[in-house]
From Swiss-Prot:
Its cofactor is FAD. Keywords: FAD, Flavoprotein, Oxidoreductase, Tricarboxylic acid cycle. Residues 521-548 are annotated as: Disordered. This is Probable malate:quinone oxidoreductase. The gene is mqo. It comes from Escherichia coli (strain 55989 / EAEC). PANTHER family: L-2-HYDROXYGLUTARATE DEHYDROGENASE, MITOCHONDRIAL. It comes from the Bacteria. GO terms for molecular function: 2-hydroxyglutarate dehydrogenase activity; L-malate dehydrogenase (quinone) activity.
Length: 548
């Protein structure tokens, strides 16, 4: 009995010693120049910029999952579109006088050119390898039916011809021509149906997860970069010297450590809002978030996949958010082609696919509850749309698919749950609160912490978004000759607009196409066909947009 007691006592002492050692380790404070919260494409892109701009800065990246690029950046959790407004009709709204506004489309395209240049530069440096593993040429098409929609697309095409960024786009109302471009879309369709399509050969499909993994793998080669997986941020506290102490829990062994950082970037996707609120900076009080998920129908049947090589976007129906437009897309995932159709909106209170059902509730505060209520009251059509989407049956989704693929067979398709997108709700002096489409960099006045909120266009514009962040929080350094020279080496068009400069546009497109292994055909002169005039449109209540 005495031996057993002694043995148990020894075990208890040993376990206590292990516990004390773990606590001692947790109390140790790690120091870093830059803390990147989240292992997605935004953190990876910012880290890559800073590695070139300030190679001596130490960086630490923390990710709560067991690997990087497993949430929104994962190729299966997003549509993989290189958003450049070549086919997305929501970026070219029709004005009340019938004219087409192209300002937003031009801005989106300019932004994607920055991303292409950033990726091409990383390929040349050996940071990104084998471009075909993450970006591939997939033509971008818009496709509509019905007289009003055909008239709209014709006018859109004519309006975009005024921009050097959209040269090379083709337009057709001929069934045979459109069938040649997208056989699945036309086979089995009523030959009398009035249809129209535009096609741009230089469209792209992008695997943002693969880009993220390669960027982070390159960062890991440096001794002053640390990646901590299965690590969740539990607290952020500003210190008297304007550094930050961030408490990070190890989800595998239950220990915690403090990281003292001079600059903190919150690039945690849907979790960014809650962490921004945790920081306590006053700028966070203006924001709330509302989660919307997305589902896609997926086909891997070779008879389907090999018969379709395009991303084909339609036009949102009346009363639906413009960004909700259905599309049938060629994707290249895990090294093989598949076809996706969707998205269909879903609802969950989670802010991340791997998040908590308490995310929405825990992010609601006395500061943002009223803006959220105002958005709900002012956007009944949006609420009605989301409810109708959640109620869709398997048959409803299949009927939606048949509008774009008339000869589709149910057995060729399965349903896939993609990622969560947290929509920005921002306090507004006039309306109380507004739903904001897009992404927004929120930072403190001192430039010591910044977060990226929002969802669209998201990953495809990671490079320009992180440029905006650098200018916002490192303004003095950005204006220095050293940083200016480095940024212009990374992004040759930095500080200039390509739109309107045909020679510069062609030069950058040719350069990035060659480096990234993408198709490039020098476009013909802009179409000089007289611009069609649309009839003035009756003013309709605007439906708030969301990202799926």
């Amino acid at each position: 009995m005495k031996k057993v007691t002694a043995m148990l006592f020894s075990m208890a002492v040993g376990l206590n010693a292990v516990s004390m050692a773990a606590k001692a380790k947790a109390s140790e404070e790690q120091e870093t120049d830059v803390l990147l919260i989240g292992g997605g494409i935004m953190s990876a892109t910012l880290g890559t910029y800073l590695r070139e701009l300030e190679p001596e800065w130490s960086m630490t990246m923390v990710e709560r999952l067991e690997g990087v690029a497993q949430e929104s950046s994962n190729g299966w959790n997003n549509a993989g579109t290189g958003h450049s407004a070549l086919m997305e009709l929501n970026y070219t709204p029709q004005n009340a006088d019938g004219s087409i506004s192209i300002e937003k489309a031009v801005a989106i395209n300019e932004a994607f050119q920055i991303s292409r240049q950033f990726w091409a530069h990383q390929v040349e440096r050996g940071v990104l390898r084998t471009p075909r593993s993450f970006i591939n040429t997939v033509p971008h098409m818009s496709f509509v039916w019905g007289e009003d929609n055909v008239n709209f697309l014709r006018a859109r095409y004519a309006a975009l011809q005024q921009s050097s960024l959209f040269r090379g786009m083709r337009y057709s109302e001929d069934h045979a021509q459109i069938k040649e471009w997208a056989p699945l879309v036309m086979e089995g369709r009523d030959p009398q149906q009035k249809v129209a399509a535009t096609r741009t050969e230089m469209g792209t499909d992008v695997n943002y997860g693969e880009i993220t993994r390669q960027l982070i793998a390159s960062l890991q080669k440096k001794s002053n970069f640390s990646l901590q997986l299965s690590s969740e941020v539990r607290a952020l506290k500003r210190n008297d010297d304007n550094t930050w102490t961030v408490t990070v829990a190890d989800l595998k062994n239950g220990t915690a450590q403090n990281i003292r950082a001079k600059f903190v970037f919150i690039g945690a996707g849907g979790a960014a809002l809650k962490l921004l609120q945790e920081s306590g900076i006053p700028e966070a009080k203006d924001y709330a978030g509302f989660p919307v998920g997305g589902q896609f129908l997926v086909s891997e049947n070779p008879d389907v996949v090999n018969h379709h090589l395009a991303k084909v976007y339609g036009k949102a129906s009346v009363g639906a958010p413009p960004m909700s437009v259905p599309h049938i897309d060629t994707r290249v995932l895990d090294g093989k082609r598949v076809v996706l159709f969707g998205p269909f909106a879903t609802f969950s209170t989670k802010f991340l696919k791997n998040g908590s059902l308490w995310d929405l509730m825990s992010s609601t505060t006395t500061s943002n509850v009223m803006p959220m209520m105002h958005v709900g009251l002012d956007n009944f059509d949006l609420v009605k749309y989301l409810v109708s989407q959640v109620m869709l049956s398997e048959e409803d989704r299949f009927e939606a698919l048949k509008e774009y693929y008339p000869q589709a067979k149910k057995e060729d398709w399965r349903l896939w749950q993609a990622g969560q997108r947290v929509q920005i709700i921002k306090r507004d002096a006039e309306k109380g609160g507004v739903l904001r489409l897009g992404t927004e960099v929120v930072s403190d006045q001192q430039g010591t912490i910044a977060a990226l909120l929002g969802a669209s266009p998201g990953a495809s514009t990671a490079a320009p978004i992180m440029l905006d962040l650098l200018e916002k929080v490192f303004g003095d350094r950005v204006s220095s000759p050293q940083w200016q020279a480095t940024l212009k080496a990374i992004v040759p068009s930095y500080g200039r607009k390509l739109n309107g400069d045909v020679a510069a546009t062609e030069r950058e497109l040719q350069y990035t196409s060659e480096v990234l292994g993408l198709k490039y055909d020098k476009p013909q002169a802009a179409d000089s066909t007289p611009k069609p005039q649309l009839k003035p449109q009756p003013v309709q209540k605007e439906v708030a947009d969301i990202a799926l």
